Amino acid sequence: MILLLVCTLPLQSTPRPTREGMGEGPTLRLTLDECIAMARRQSVDAAVDLGELKSAYWQWRSYKADLLPEVSFSATAPSYNKRYTSYQQADGGVSYVRNDYLGLNGSLYVSQKIWPTGGTLSVETSLDFLHQSGSGGGNQFMSMPVALTLSQPIFGINHLKWNRRIEPLKYREAQARFLTETEQVAMKAISLFFNLILAGEQVGIARQNLQKAEELYKVAQAKREMGTISENDVLQLKLDVLNAHSALTDSESNRQARQFALRAFLDVEAEIEPIVPEGQGVGLPLHLDYEEVLSHALQNNAFATTMRRRQMEADYSVAAAKANRRSINLYAQMGYTGMADKLGGAYRDLLSKEVIQVGFSVPILDWGKRKGQRKVAESNREIVQGQLRQQAQEFRQNIFILTEQFNNQAEQLRIACEADTIAQKRYNTNIETFKIGSISMLDISDATRAKDEARQNRISQLHYYWYYYYQLRSIALWDFEKGCDITADIEKLVKTP
């Protein structure tokens, strides 16, 4: 890409970050690519983005684990009681008797959620031991070798089925958002990088202006002695020298502030010397097609997944409000149990155990409360649908505007480079003309201002080119240079300590 090769400022690039002893401490010389890579690797913003990804990953893992069989064991070992309790006799009288016993029990429990129906199926086995002290006491074992239990809601909302639809979208959304935020870290690095370049250029401009102002002031003093220039022009040049001193002080303070901002963002101690991108634009596109960018964005960006998730959550709320009109639950248990004074006997001559329960709750008079809840959910769904349509239009519009801005930026950069060259030539010509002839101070001031603005605009347009490019990458999650999706090894990232 010849355009960026021609338009870059004459600074030497380096293949790797290097530290050189300059001034009071070491200096870290960075190219733009190295700055972006460092920001993605060690900036605070990148660490926050990774933390959010890890949170979403483990939430996804917890959801998947919730669908798998769960095995649990519970026990009480021991349970000792020595107390008096009330006892009702056969004739209806109540007396207090002394209880003195030692109990042990344990159970193994396996449960599985049934997502198609929303119920829970479990298998349980347990053993209880009781030792009664005192006269007539002894040992007693009670076993439950196996018991099968089903708990099933009927006509209710199937939360498992809805979560099975929504949770994968949440995780996919988190992955896409992480990739977008990674590109946004690059965008922030680009802005801070070029802000420092621009601040350094402003210092250079201020020093050049001060040097030229002092030269012109000396020339004006000589001309004043010869009577070829007015006292007013000499005073104006003296004022220009003072203003140039002030501008240099301000620009140096601004450069230090920009230096600190980039160092803090990259989490480095050394002074940073940014290298203006020279030749790094080779291979990047000069023109992007809106339909192609939009297609990649709709496929990869978190926005598309967010729209589907929000629509599904709105449907879920409506379904839950409708299911809240009545509640019916089925509970069924089948198994075997045995009792004996010895452990082996507790597993012989087993007796069957069956429990069936159907519980229901039907509102008779609620004064329209449940109907109101359903209407609220339906209204909220309509609001969400309207918001999603509006946001989809804005999403497409923003991509169109950004694509047009990027496509126009190459021409803007070419114009800025040419304007910088012309403004510098005009400035030099005016300075030499003043030294050897006569030219108004207004012309010199105007040439100085135009030269300064053109040089800064040249850097700004180069900044916009890179910023727009990475902004399109962050939206489409597509590497336009390599022609492939922007991806990451999520499993490796989240498991990195």
Language-model-derived ranges and their functions:
Residues 48-63, 181, 185-206, 215, ...:
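Amphipathic alpha-helical coiled-coil segments
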Residues 3-12:
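Hydrophobic h-region of N-terminal signal peptides that target proteins for export
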Residues 11-25, 72, 79-84, 270-276, ...:
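Acidic, low-complexity, intrinsically disordered peripheral segments
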Residues 21-36:
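Regulatory alphaC helix of protein kinase catalytic domains
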Residues 37-155, 187, 268, 294-372, ...:
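A small-residue-enriched
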Residues 30, 165-171, 175-296, 405, ...:
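Periplasmic alpha-helical coiled-coil/stalk elements that build and connect Gram-negative outer-membrane
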Residues 160, 164, 367-370, 374:
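Interdomain signal-transducing alpha-helical coiled-coil linkers
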Residues 251, 302, 384, 461:
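Metallo-beta-lactamase
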